[in-house]
Amino acid sequence: MSSQTLTAANVFVVLRQLRSLCYPIPSFASSQTIPSRAYSNYNAARHTSLVVPANIAIKQWHFAAAYSTAPPSKTAKESGEDTDLLEPTKPKPKKPVPAWAVQKNALKEKFKEGWKPRKKVSPDTMESIRKLHSMDSVKFSTKNLAEEFKISAEAIRRILKSKWRATEEEEIDRRNRWEKRKLRIQEQMMELGLRHTDPISKEGPSSDMESSHRNKSSSAIESLAGEYLSQSRGQESSPQKRRDPWDVTADDLPGTIRTSTRDAWPQERFPERRGSSQRRTRRDEYIERGPRGKPDW
């Protein structure tokens, strides 16, 4: 029994020493345990300096080094990436923008809807807009009129708001100017051959002027055509049959010169061609000359 108790006591001593190494307490020198009440009554006045033997401190240092929880040291690559992220990134130098690109961007910013020029409205159209709006302001509202006449709503609003009206003299002057403009445009188109009919009504004082302009334009076209039209018409009316210059006929007499022309005869020798009824046969030629004057065929 004594041997068993001794071995048990030794085991307890070893366990206490191991416990002191793992969980150090204020009194390392004594092997007695400190009750929990002592920790509750502990204060700063009763605090005593901790005295730790040298061998125990070394063992405790080795234990902490073996089970260190410090983060692993960063590699050179990771440290380089961190420094790159921390450093402020320098903006890349922009390429110089050409002048045409600057102008294009400015136009895009100014005209966001693109090329949409303002539409001009004639005085007659403005008067009709006012009449429609006065007839039914709900049906012919500013928005509906703008969609119908393809102009902005602001332009419709200004037309309805304006109180200016042309006098009778100004209206007559405007009508005359418009008539002259129509005639000028029509004359130009007829000279170019783009229009052959007169769309303007013949009623009114300008009918004589229109007819004179039309006659002048037609005569100008005929004079420009000139002889070319007459020649082409003559050729179309009387087409001539092409003659083979190597066909032998009764007109082939000794001493004649064959050529490759269409008539196959020199013009100075035969100025006028004889018709088919006046052609002389070889028999007539032989009878006229007699047997001695027989040609060398």
From Swiss-Prot:
Polar residues: bias regions: 229-238
Keywords on record: Mitochondrion, Transit peptide
Chain segments carrying region Disordered: 71-97, 189-297
Transit peptide, from-to: 1-47
Compositionally skewed regions (Basic and acidic residues) per UniProt: 265-275, 282-297
Pfam families xref list: Neugrin
GO terms under cellular component: mitochondrion; nucleus
Record flagged with keyword Transit peptide: yes
Cell compartment(s), UniProt: Mitochondrion
Function: Required for respiratory activity and maintenance and expression of the mitochondrial genome.
Similarity annotation: Belongs to the RRG9 family.
Protein name as it appears in the record: Required for respiratory growth protein 9, mitochondrial
Biological source species: Arthroderma gypseum (strain ATCC MYA-4604 / CBS 118893) (Microsporum gypseum)
